[in-house]
């Protein structure tokens, strides 16, 4: 397939048009004619857990959840794992899920938080853990008895952890050994008296269970062993005593960053999640079947990874968990496991790409020259002709790279943040496979847009899946309208608004945000600004945000106003603007220093100070103070400023960086300092590799 071939994406639907004339659409999946009629339930009104139970029974002997067994430690005390994956079968996983559900049900009164919001009743527990077999077993066990899970993760920060616990009032939290220390610190620091029980994941996590349980008890928890207390036989409770989740049951409350700074609890139902599986099957956008293998390393606390695992289990495929971390074991794990589809984020691919090029450089001599000749030849062939294979170089050079991924990889699906085109191009060259880009958010059950498996262009995020329909609503204040013209062609732009079975059920106990999220026609306003490109098959590209918020390459949202309100308290800062985007791993700050305070602290004159905006002593002074403020404010690692750009001209009305009401015009600042930002970004990228 050549680059000139354009796959057709978003298609206009005539029926059910919302009111108003400032929108383009509705757009629907190109193979559909009528969204309302064709969004039918292929699963006969089943819940996700009902479907998964049927698959676990039908394919009981197939391998389901796998991990590499620990066989020892090296001289540094680091774990050594077997060179193979060992699996629990679908039948074994089903039995563990039922045991967990029964034992949780028996202790329901002491362990479960009972709550309600709107028309939903909740039985709540929390999960605070890394990816492991126990995570999936506990999650499905909860679904077997209509227990809703509230998910937490370490990068939330301590204040956000407290906020979620206060909002849900969870009595019980399931925790992996690596997070026990942080959990205990949070409980004691914030005096979370209602959080009284902790269940330790100790089946596959290679921990000293006795020691970690004692640590939990010292912090004031009633501590339980997942293995000893929740995987034991329970003859007191029958399967029929369990209240199996129905399609309308809220499966999970997934917390995501909010524009106010407080996390928002996104309520996702069983219907939402099975609609994702239904969409994948109906659209045939991803080559997913019972022969598939998935490596799980993206956090299960985020809905994307849960959606992926649900999809693989929904077709009775295999899932293997990462043994260590992305940096330490991911590549070795993949070479052993052999994933067929790789679900990842740009940041991980950037790390892998660096390892590949480092490997080229380490070859030296003629082998290094051969590797780079092969790379540049394939890249040029792709850009000119759309060809991603090479008869000679694929065997001589790139076969070794394919082996790094296990030799079975059919495609990579990159999500969470937009993927830079050059990154996608490199992996087409390395692996001779298509790169799919998915785009979604927690509120969309993790997925709403997807490029096609056969499309090699990777210019846009593709089109809507068959699980949503979309309108584009003009945002004239930001300069985006549905009448925009590029090169003589109408390319509508505006806020992306969506409707359909993938859309969430609202924010937990947050009436204000719920009132803002949906319009009178039932469309969810995403806050993302998108543009339709007719000459790329009506593909959609994210071009801006309606509100002042952005996402880093890890997929984490950053709220600049929240950070600026803290950092501006520094005596050494007169003005500050936090900047970042989805290709960056860290934020940077554009700062106008307070000349008087800085000069005094550095014992120089103001005239001397303003001569050098790159003064390392000045940068160190300001960075140290920002670090102090970040610690005091309990900012997480991604909210801490590690890179700064200094300017003494400041943001003014005259240079159009301030409005008459003294608000920073972020776009103008970005444009004004574009060259310096790009230079600093290049340094940041080099340092993070």
Label the predicted regions:
Residues 98-102, 266-287, 394, 399:
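Conserved structural elements of the adenylate-forming
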